[in-house]
């Protein structure tokens, strides 16, 4: 996978910020890829096109997760279903699958079970800092993900995550 320039990563983040919670319908040609982030402070459902450019992003502030653990299972499912429905409305297509992430050192099933309960087929899962490393196609770097309740760190060498830890493990 070819590394992308940092300005391209920033452009993608700026687009995501600009379209966040924008329900205006858009036409997207080709496949889309959906990700679900169950955070301590919020829940996000984002869709990107086949080039990795955000085409839909919905965020809802929530307290369904605490320190990387889902503490309100029903609430998390309800929010994910609502945000997926909003994504479907914006894109004019049914969402049946998604990827998700989790804080390093926690059980991935805490996130994947929510997707399953929301009737989404799991495409992939990885710890949160590793997801950013993949998105940015980093070759050699350290990624720090400072969240609302956890801080994850990943070290990347030759494009592979060689270490990934959470502040709770340190």
Describe each model-derived feature in a short phrase:
Residues 1-40, 44-146, 158-169:
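Nucleotide/phosphate-binding catalytic cleft detector across ATP-hydrolyzing
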């Amino acid at each position: 996978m070819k590394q992308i320039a940092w300005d391209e990563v920033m452009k993608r983040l700026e687009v995501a910020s600009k379209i966040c919670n924008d329900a205006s319908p858009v036409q997207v040609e080709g496949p889309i890829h959906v990700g679900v982030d169950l955070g301590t402070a919020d829940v996000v459902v984002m869709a990107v096109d086949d080039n990795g450019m955000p085409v839909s992003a919905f965020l809802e502030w929530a307290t369904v997760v605490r320190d990387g653990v889902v503490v309100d299972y029903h609430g998390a499912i309800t929010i994910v279903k609502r945000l997926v429905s909003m994504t479907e409305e914006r894109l004019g297509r049914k969402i049946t699958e998604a990827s998700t992430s989790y804080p390093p050192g926690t059980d991935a099933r805490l996130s994947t079970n929510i997707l399953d309960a929301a009737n989404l087929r799991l495409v992939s899962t990885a710890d949160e800092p590793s997801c950013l490393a993949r998105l940015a196609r980093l070759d050699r770097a350290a990624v720090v993900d400072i969240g609302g309740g956890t801080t994850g760190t990943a070290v990347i060498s030759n494009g592979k995550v060689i270490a990934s830890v959470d502040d709770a493990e340190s």
